[in-house]
Regions:
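N-terminal Sec-pathway targeting helices
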Residues: 1-14
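Hydrophobic alpha-helical membrane-insertion segments, chiefly the h-region
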Residues: 15-22
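Auxiliary, metal-adjacent structural segments of Zn-dependent hydrolase domains
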Residues: 25-63
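Acidic helix-start/capping segments at beta-turn-to-alpha-helix junctions
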Residues: 45-51, 94-107
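Short, flexible loop/turn elements at secondary-structure junctions
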Residues: 48, 66-68, 83, 87
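Short pre-active-site segment immediately N-terminal to the catalytic Zn-binding motif
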Residues: 63-78
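Catalytic Zn2+-binding segment of zinc metalloproteases
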Residues: 82-98
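Metalloprotease/metallohydrolase-associated module, dominated by Zn2+-dependent proteases
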Residues: 99-215, 220
Length: 220
């Protein structure tokens, strides 16, 4: 009987995740303009597309609003999103670096045991879609969730699931020592794709940032 219950929960969880992913990644965005750049194309979209947040859509497409395109932040945004383009182009090279240097393993499926109410609040991200679940040191799964019932992409929290204790825990101190620059930690620390993009864009000086700066991923 217990095995049937466990199997049923697993099936329900898988269906729930598929529905969330289908809805989020089904392209509802209207492209208003296109600009060709040496490394890809920028598509200008309206503010309803991913709530106006810049993101990548393919290995060669960056999307942003007109207001971001003409703002003083444009170069910084493009630098950040260009890192995501490279992550899409060379996924195995980045995964290998995350695994060997940062201790991360990326997976398509969530670690076993995460309660459905957390999975229902999962906040998907186009820039991490190749492996949205990031498990650090084989124990801590980082993932972003909507903060409230409004499910706004701009209002999220990052949860840390302890695979061994089977519960949500605080950010491990050892993680902070490696990934934070003193008291300055990456803003989007839910996934190494976002951590790497922040490091390259904002010139962090944490041990993890130094590892990235010395890697072939940055020097090539």
């Amino acid at each position: 009987m217990i095995n049937w219950v466990v199997t049923g929960i697993g099936v329900i969880t898988s269906i729930l995740l598929l529905v969330i992913i289908w809805y989020f990644y089904n392209d509802h965005c209207i492209v208003l303009k296109r600009y060709a750049l040496p490394y890809g194309t920028v598509e200008i979209v309206d503010s309803s597309c991913q709530e106006g947040l810049p993101h990548t859509w393919s290995p060669s497409i960056i999307r942003m609003t007109e207001s971001d395109w003409i703002s003083s932040r444009r170069d910084s945004i493009l630098r950040h999103e260009r890192v995501h383009l490279r992550q899409r182009l060379e996924p195995e090279a980045w995964r290998s670096f995350y695994r060997s240097e940062w201790g991360y393993e990326l997976t398509k499926q969530p670690p076993p045991g995460i309660p459905p109410h957390w999975l229902e609040r999962l906040r998907p991200n186009p820039d991490t879609a190749d492996g949205p679940w990031a498990v650090w040191k084989g124990r801590y799964a980082f993932f972003p969730t909507y903060r409230d019932a409004k499910r706004s992409l701009r209002s999220t929290n990052v949860q840390v699931w302890d695979v061994l204790k089977k519960q949500i825990v605080d950010i491990p101190g050892s993680w902070k020592q490696h990934f934070c620059d003193g008291g300055n930690c990456p803003h989007q620390f839910e996934h190494p794709h976002e951590i790497a993009a922040e490091y390259i864009t904002n010139n962090f000086n944490s041990p993890a940032a130094q590892q990235l700066a010395e890697s072939l991923l940055v020097k090539q």
